[in-house]
Amino acid sequence: MKRFTVLILAIFVAASTVEADVRFSLSGSSSTSYSKFIGDLRKALPSNGTVYNITLLLSSASGASRYTLMTLSNYDGKAITVAVDVTNVYIMGYLVNSTSYFFNESDAKLASQYVFKGSTIVTLPYSGNYEKLQTAAGKIREKIPLGFPALDSAITTLFHYDSTAAAAAFLVIIQTTAEASRFKYIEGQIIERISKNQVPSLATISLENEWSALSKQIQLAQTNNGTFKTPVVITDDKGQRVEITNVTSKVVTKNIQLLLNYKQNVAAFDEDVSAKH
């Protein structure tokens, strides 16, 4: 019996002491600490070099090397550790103590074989794409406030796994971490919301939806004299629709920080990638 107890304890300790690659704590946080965290997250994503000085994510990765881990702590010090796919910055699932929660999708199921080993696995009742999360939350992203207070609430919700509020919590965490790592503008929008919650701007939602399209056109522009083969329409910070046609646009030169690798993700680009996170 003693040996059995020791074994259970060893499994619990192994699952609950996962070493994260990047960390962010809301306790004592500031714009500086948040920007450092987002910068660290970008650096934690291995790349295939750059395209027009923008980091090009790996086309593929295998085994445990396909994932990076980030630990997020609320104002009370309660923490969750989140698994992120390094090829697309998609969140696969998260760990609290000895229990892990993964999205109900093939990529997340694969991730569960390599991260949070020894944990008790719970499969969430939805996948991680925006459409499914919004349906589960009963709200679209445009209606869900972002900010440090919202992040605190989201971490708390996932820490205790409140099933009725988890989907909305994921929407907050995805935008505060993954989307902010993809776009400097979104990082700045979160910083503006350090002390308050506010719904995302139309420009934020637009950039999130068009990340894959922008990634593709920026890569294709390399063989087209810097011109997009297909213009990408986004909404700017004034609420105006703007057509992006080449790599001289500020969206390319000052905003986007990561590119989804087009050459090895053709199938993904052929899907409705804007629905994914």
Curated annotation (Swiss-Prot):
Q: Its Enzyme Commission number?
A: 3.2.2.22
PANTHER family reported in the protein's UniProt record = PTHR33453, RIBOSOME-INACTIVATING PROTEIN
Q: Which Gene Ontology BP annotations are present? A: defense response to virus; negative regulation of translation
Catalytic center residues: 179
**Can you state which reaction this protein catalyses?**
Endohydrolysis of the N-glycosidic bond at one specific adenosine on the 28S rRNA
A Pfam family cross-referenced in the UniProt record is RIP
What InterPro entries does UniProt report for this protein, alphabetically? Ribosome-inact_prot_sf, Ribosome_inactivat_1/2, Ribosome_inactivat_prot, Ribosome_inactivat_prot_CS, Ribosome_inactivat_prot_sub1, Ribosome_inactivat_prot_sub2
Q: What is this protein called?
A: Ribosome-inactivating protein luffin-alpha
Cystine pairings recorded for this chain = none
| SUPFAM superfamilies, per the entry | Ribosome inactivating proteins (RIP)
Gene3D superfamilies xref list: Ricin (A subunit), domain 1, Ricin (A Subunit), domain 2
